[in-house]
């Protein structure tokens, strides 16, 4: 028996040699004791609960106390880390609720009995040899279920790392220790013959507990003695690491052999060199990392630990709040415009390349290349050195106004495909089924379209003609009837997944991953033409003449349908082109490189015209009224001006920033498909205002304003008025004509508003001006007034440009000069009317009107009646015009002091002096001999001989009388800021404060004295004072000193 003790390979097959046939076990030898203990363990181990089984198993594993045995069992249980064991462990057994079962008294007695047996076996196991421990543990693991095996594997891994760390100076990694078969091992043997050995190295490493000259023995060098070397290795390792099996540890208590549940939880949780980085990071960084996960993965993270569950819950709440805020912003942005005129429309001339017969563009004869700045990049400069022709195209600021948002579907699906062609239905599919969505009632129609064997990847709905086209992963295109949902036709021919489709009349074009573009006849289902790329097709478009297709390589090809040939290939994108749009003149392509490129559809012109940059890949694009509409993967729809590349508006599809997969435009309605929902933007109905109509409306408005002003000036010209400044009465905003009080000369006031004349309001006559001196004179006045009305025709009046000086604020001097010019023009012969009352100018600084006014609004009434009443209320007077002769004296310029040579011909007019010749200086007293005077004194048919006192504007003299009339301007007193003065926050005494003030004053005086004085300016100021007769005592001449003792203004 002692000879076979070390043969572990035959350990399960050891038998007692002392036993008889009637009693096979002697119960004295180690083999019989082991067999009896295993038999008794099988009786109760499978009947106890999971907690007791786990406690007993962990207690057994803790008593191994051998690095060799721990490594041996770790290798055996390594298969428990596979996916099948992990899946079985993650399952929850709902039939057993541990800890909540009410135990009866009998069960409690049985538990106590079983616990006593477990303690006895643990005590026996702790005092057993390594051979007994190895065999009993192997047989015990055979009775464990998968969950217990996983627990055992975790506990053994933790215990092994603990034992390894307890050995100080262990320089050999555990990977250098392994099991290897003996060299004389036969494959026919029932058990595997293994022994523990160290991997061969260049140098042997000593163990910590051994002397320096003792080394771990490797494999047997002599092939004749494998068993001795194996025995020596095992005994040496057992001696070094665990000592003798029958020696218990100091302080060993057999009552504590059963492990508590807390210790089991700590051991079975596993031991790893990795750390939970989410727990160690700050909370905001942990939430930022978890926020990058999708919702499904975030729900899984909540099962990792309590900390992760709390973080995941907070991230969900933050995402929900952020989404709510962004959705509110999305709804509110529909009623906000960034200074863009949403009603703008115009017809502009757009350059297009001029082509020759072979379809190539014409270049200029003498090309000039010029570097363009950022502001110079537009459509007109894109055709550099190319001959172009102008095409009239309409432009509008589409989708720049206010809009309402309606959610049609709120289901997250990144594989959703939709199509909308106007009307009330939307075709939606994300798998093999297709259903229709009513956008008015926001509900699905019960008709479903089934028949595809694979998921649907392309749709085209034609609601007007009552059919639906769908392209699928099953390589087929199906033609469906909308009302019945029956597939009536199948288009077969593609050898790859259908990725895109487009329809024009009865021609269908489709592209697939088989690098083919096929043209079909919708009525017959036959393939008419096939075009090929070298890469899978991602987008295709068709019209009556051309087909445009793009592929994953980034190439865009234009095909001619009738001729079935390639027109041109457009290259410039660095990524796959996913979307296309083209019309008669231009082509747009959107790519994964974040660019939308504009090309010309005319002939074979292949140069890129414009590029519109996006932060992420472009998924859909359209061109409408010279406005580029693009959908980006950042969740925004952008509207660009095609002419200059400016971004006019940005529409957010949702608050989460999900990519906009596609959008469809019909009228003032836009249907948007994102990964998280389907939206409809309903824009307001806009009446477009073209630039030509605006100019016409502006001209008509100006003509109406001119007519109103002319009628107002006609009224003012027929009455005695006084012009009053708006500064006198701020509350008065209208034009007023006021009759004067009796006893004063005929006078009236006019208050001019600075804005345009929207209406004219007359002040009614407050009191009669008195009866006329003779009724004959009144009759004559009426007669003359009627004659005057006949003479005042628009054709006879001279044409004058419209003056807009009243529409802008002016200074008082400008206002008085304007009134004076009007008076002189009024007194001239061209505007001289009989019976026209004179006007006098009231000083602009004079007092405002103190007497009450009665305002009469004659809007809608006859103005002529009011004019006649005002004309008859003022008696006419005779008018005589006089003039003062002028004296003109011509001067000869002195050319000697000219800066130019005498040979240079001068263009300066001859100077002259013009001054009035007064009566005292004239020879002959009152005789008038001047021809100019005779011409001036001649009377016309509309003049009289009575003298008029001229209305002159005299410059006010500087004096107290004039200054008193002027309004004193309000003085603004600003208090000093104490914080600005006491910026240093220094506490000073009274004496220190005085010293500080004196120092500041000296500093200020020194700064003022150092100022540079211009001697020229000082001399000029002195001469001016001397001319005015003012003293110049304070004037100091340069280099001289004033000597007042010698006399006034005497300098030495």
UniProtKB/Swiss-Prot annotation:
Biased composition regions of type Basic and acidic residues, renumbered to the chain: 775-786
Alphabetized Gene3D superfamilies for the sequence: 1.20.1280.50, YVTN repeat-like/Quinoprotein amine dehydrogenase
Stretches assigned to the F-box domain: 276-323
Keyword Repeat tagged: yes
UniProt keywords, alphabetically: Coiled coil, Repeat, Ubl conjugation pathway, WD repeat
Annotated segments matching region Disordered: 766-805
InterPro entries, alphabetized: F-box-like_dom_sf, G-protein_beta_WD-40_rep, SCF_subunit_WD-repeat, WD40/YVTN_repeat-like_dom_sf, WD40_repeat_CS, WD40_repeat_dom_sf, WD40_rpt
Coiled coil: 690-719, 986-1010
WD repeats: 169-206, 409-447, 451-490, 493-532, 534-569, 572-609, 611-652
A GO cellular component annotation in the UniProt record: cytosol
Induction: By disease-causing laminin A mutants also inducing CBX5 and CBX1 proteasomal degradation.
PANTHER family reported for this sequence: F-BOX AND WD REPEAT DOMAIN CONTAINING PROTEIN 10B-RELATED (PTHR19872:SF7), UBIQUITIN LIGASE SPECIFICITY FACTOR/HREP PROTEIN (PTHR19872)
Role: Probable substrate-recognition component of a SCF (SKP1-CUL1-F-box protein)-type E3 ubiquitin ligase complex which mediates the ubiquitination and subsequent proteasomal degradation of target proteins. Overexpression is leading to degradation of CBX5 and CBX1.
Protein name, per record: F-box/WD repeat-containing protein 10
Lineage: Eukaryota, Metazoa, Chordata, Craniata, Vertebrata
């Amino acid at each position: 028996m002692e000879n076979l003790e070390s043969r572990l390979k035959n350990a399960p097959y050891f038998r007692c040699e002392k036993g008889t046939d009637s009693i096979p076990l002697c119960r004295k030898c180690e083999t019989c004791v082991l067999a009896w203990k295993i038999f008794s363990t099988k009786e109760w181990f499978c009947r106890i609960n999971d907690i007791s089984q786990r406690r007993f198993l962990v207690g057994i594993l803790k008593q191994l106390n051998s690095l060799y045995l721990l490594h041996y069992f770790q290798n055996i249980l390594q298969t428990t880390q596979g996916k099948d064991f992990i899946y079985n462990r993650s399952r929850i057994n709902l039939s057993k609720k541990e800890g909540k079962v009410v135990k009866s008294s009998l069960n409690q007695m049985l538990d106590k009995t079983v616990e006593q047996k477990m303690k006895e076996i643990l005590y026996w196991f702790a005092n057993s040899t390594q051979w007994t421990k190895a065999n009993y543990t192997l047989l015990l693991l055979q009775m464990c279920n998968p969950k217990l095996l996983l627990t055992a594997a975790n506990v053994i891994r933790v215990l092994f790392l603990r034992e390894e760390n307890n050995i100080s100076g262990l320089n050999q990694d555990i990977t250098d220790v392994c099991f290897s078969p003996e060299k004389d091992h036969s494959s026919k043997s029932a058990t595997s013959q293994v022994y523990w050995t160290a991997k061969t190295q260049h140098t042997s490493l000593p163990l910590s507990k051994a002397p320096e000259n003792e080394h771990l023995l490797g494999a047997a060098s002599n092939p004749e003695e494998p068993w001795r070397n194996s025995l020596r290795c095992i005994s040496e390792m057992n001696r070094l690491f665990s000592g003798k099996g029958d020696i218990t540890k100091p302080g060993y208590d057999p009552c504590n052999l059963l492990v508590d549940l807390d210790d089991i939880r700590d051991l079975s949780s596993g031991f790893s060199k990795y750390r939970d980085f989410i727990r160690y990071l700050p909370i905001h960084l942990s939430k930022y990392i978890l926020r990058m996960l999708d919702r499904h993965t975030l729900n899984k993270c909540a099962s990792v630990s309590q900390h992760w569950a709390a973080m995941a819950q907070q991230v969900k709440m933050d995402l929900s709040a952020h989404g709510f805020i962004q959705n509110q912003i999305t709804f509110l942005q529909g009623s906000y415009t960034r200074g863009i005129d949403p009603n703008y429309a115009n017809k502009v001339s757009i350059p297009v390349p001029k082509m020759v017969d072979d379809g190539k563009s014409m270049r200029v004869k003498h090309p000039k290349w010029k570097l363009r700045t950022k502001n110079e990049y537009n459509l007109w400069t894109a055709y550099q050195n190319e001959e172009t022709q102008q095409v009239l195209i309409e432009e509008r600021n589409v989708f720049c106004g206010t809009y309402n948002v309606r959610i049609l579907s709120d289901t997250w699906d990144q594989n959703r495909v939709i199509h909308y062609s106007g009307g009330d239905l939307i075709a939606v599919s994300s798998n093999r089924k297709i259903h229709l969505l009513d956008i008015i009632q926001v509900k699905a129609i019960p008709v479903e379209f089934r028949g595809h064997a694979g998921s649907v990847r392309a749709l085209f709905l034609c609601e007007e003609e009552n059919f639906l086209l769908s392209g699928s992963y099953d390589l087929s295109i199906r033609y469906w009837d909308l009302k019945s949902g029956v597939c009536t036709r199948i288009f077969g021919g593609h050898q790859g997944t259908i990725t895109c489709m487009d329809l024009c009349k009865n021609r269908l074009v489709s592209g697939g991953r088989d690098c083919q573009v096929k043209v079909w006849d919708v009525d017959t289902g036959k393939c008419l033409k096939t075009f090929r790329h070298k890469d899978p097709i991602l987008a295709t478009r068709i019209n009556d003449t051309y087909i445009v297709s793009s592929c994953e390589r980034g190439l865009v090809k234009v095909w001619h349908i009738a001729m079935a040939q390639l027109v041109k290939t457009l290259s410039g994108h660095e990524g796959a082109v996913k979307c296309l749009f083209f019309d008669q003149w231009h082509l747009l392509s959107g790519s994964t490189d974040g660019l939308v490129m504009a090309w010309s559809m005319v002939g074979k012109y292949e140069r890129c015209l414009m590029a519109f940059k996006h932060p992420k890949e472009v998924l859909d694009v359209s061109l409408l009224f010279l406005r580029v509409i693009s959908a980006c993967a950042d969740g925004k729809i952008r509207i660009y001006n095609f002419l200059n590349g400016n971004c006019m508006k940005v529409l957010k599809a949702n608050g989460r920033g999900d990519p906009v997969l596609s959008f469809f435009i019909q009228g003032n309605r836009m249907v948007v498909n994102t990964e998280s929902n389907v939206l409809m933007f309903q824009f307001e109905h806009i009446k477009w205002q073209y630039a030509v109509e605006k100019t016409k409306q502006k001209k008509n408005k100006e003509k109406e304003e001119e007519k109103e002003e002319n009628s107002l000036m006609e009224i003012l010209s027929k009455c005695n008025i006084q012009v009053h400044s708006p500064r006198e009465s701020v509350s008065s905003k209208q034009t007023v004509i006021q009759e004067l009080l009796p006893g004063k000369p005929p006078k009236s006031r006019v208050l001019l508003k600075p804005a345009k004349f929207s209406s004219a309001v007359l002040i009614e006559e407050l009191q009669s001006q008195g009866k006329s001196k003779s009724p004959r004179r009144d009759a004559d006045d009426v007669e003359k007034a009627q004659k005057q009305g006949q003479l005042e025709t628009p054709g006879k009046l001279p044409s004058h440009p419209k003056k807009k000086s009243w529409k802008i604020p002016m200074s008082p001097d400008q206002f008085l000069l304007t009134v004076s010019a009007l008076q002189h023009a009024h007194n001239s012969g061209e505007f001289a009317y009989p019976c026209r009352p004179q006007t006098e100018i009231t000083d602009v600084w004079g007092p405002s009107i103190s007497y009450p006014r009665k305002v009469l609004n004659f809007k809608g009434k006859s103005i002529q009646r009011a004019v006649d009443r005002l004309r008859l209320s003022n008696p006419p007077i005779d008018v005589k015009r006089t003039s003062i002769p002028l004296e003109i004296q011509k001067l000869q310029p002195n050319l000697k002091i000219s800066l130019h040579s005498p040979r240079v011909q001068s263009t300066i007019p001859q100077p002259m002096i013009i001054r009035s010749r007064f009566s005292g200086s004239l020879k002959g007293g009152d005789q008038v001999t001047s021809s100019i005077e005779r011409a001036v004194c001649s009377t016309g048919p509309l003049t009289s001989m009575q003298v008029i006192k001229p209305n002159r504007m005299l410059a006010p003299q500087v004096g107290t009388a004039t200054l008193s009339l002027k309004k004193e301007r309000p003085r603004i007193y600003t208090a000093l800021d104490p914080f600005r003065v006491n910026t240093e926050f220094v506490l000073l005494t009274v004496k220190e404060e005085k010293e500080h003030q004196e120092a500041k004053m000296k500093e200020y005086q020194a700064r003022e004295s150092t100022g540079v004085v211009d001697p020229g300016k000082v001399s000029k100021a002195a001469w001016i004072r001397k001319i005015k007769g003012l003293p110049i005592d304070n004037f100091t001449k340069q280099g001289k000193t004033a000597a007042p003792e010698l006399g006034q203004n005497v300098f030495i």
